[in-house]
Amino acid sequence: MFFIRARFIGFLDVHGYLAAKKGQQVMRSGSSIWVGSHGPIFYKVF
């Protein structure tokens, strides 16, 4: 479970970085990440 969660969070980090690099809307607030690449998508990172 820990490894799956770690890979999941890692994917979110990479996706957020790529989205920000492409100039798309990315907002990080606390433990939550909003990515506006394919519409309003909300990722909750624990």
From Swiss-Prot:
It comes from the Bacteria. This is Late transcription unit A protein. The gene is ltuA.
